[in-house]
Amino acid sequence: MDAPGQHPRIVVGVDGSDASIAALRTAGALAGPLGATVEAWACWDVPPGYGLYLVVGIEGFEYAAKQSLEQALADAFGKELPAFVHPRLVRGKASEQLIEGSRNASLLIVGRRGHGSLVLGSVSSACVSHAHCPVLVVHAPDEATHVKATTGSKSG
């Protein structure tokens, strides 16, 4: 969490999906009122079984992640990236890196990438279970219309 006098820090997991773009937009909407910075994290790694790429080079995987991050930021915010948004390319498994990134964050925001209306994706599920800060799971716009909000109270 934040030390006294520090600005809140929001970490957003970005994979280029509609849900991650919605997560970026949500972070942008929260950042202003909170005076927060937003770190847009695109995590990448060499897939298992691609040992040859370690010899030939892994730049293609990093480049693809960078392109996906740039496109997601453009989709979320338009041509001009807000000054409070800071893109980050992070090598490693997304769930592990985002959980580690949550150590010094005020909030971690991820998209829901599940199969079906009740199942979280593996990254969002791991983050909810193991993050070191509060986690907000954001649905893609087409999923949000099918979600029933609950307060957690017995009456509602």
Language-model-derived ranges and their functions:
Residues 107-130, 140, 144-147:
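Glycine-rich, Arg-bearing micro-motifs that act as flexible, cationic patches
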Residues 57-68:
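A short acidic, glycine-rich active-site loop
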Residues 39-41, 86-90, 136-138:
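General small-molecule cofactor/ligand-binding pocket signal
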Residues 74, 96, 125:
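Active-site phosphate/pyrophosphate- and oxyanion-stabilizing loops and adjacent acidic/basic residues
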Residues 15, 73, 113:
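Short glycine-/small-residue-rich Rossmann-like dinucleotide-binding loops
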Residues 2-56, 140-141, 155-156:
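Small/aliphatic-rich secondary-structure junction motif
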Residues 1-6, 19, 26, 77-108, ...:
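Structural beta-alpha unit
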